[in-house]
Amino acid sequence: MLKWMAALMGLLSSSFAGLTFAQAGADDLAGRWAVTWSNTSRNAMSLANKSGRFSGTYQNDDKDSCSVTGNFLASNQHLALQIVCPKWDIRMQGTASKDSKTIRGSYQAYVDGVGKFVMTKQ
């Protein structure tokens, strides 16, 4: 009985430690980023995190400030973002690196514009 209780406590401790790590992963993604698109243009983005949901700003090529919203799934380090600018929007899907310093993925802009992106933590 004592061994069973010790095993159960160890399992519960591991589970809660994983939850703490998952939240820290989302928190690590908050901050300033540089987004490099497949056409090699580079733009600034800032993200704030609240419980795995992101909000922020993106500066487009015309220097307009655009809104950013999104979410983070800790189990697979997957991030989904949407940038909304005055004349267009972009949907991004990517995966954060283990050290939370880069995010790589793909995007869809307009109706049929697609490509790859890399985000680098500043």
What residues fall within each predicted segment?
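Bacterial N-terminal signal peptides that target proteins for export
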Residues: 1-8
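Cleavable N-terminal signal peptides
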Residues: 9-11, 20
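Central antiparallel beta-sheet cores of small beta-barrel/beta-sandwich binding domains
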Residues: 23-122
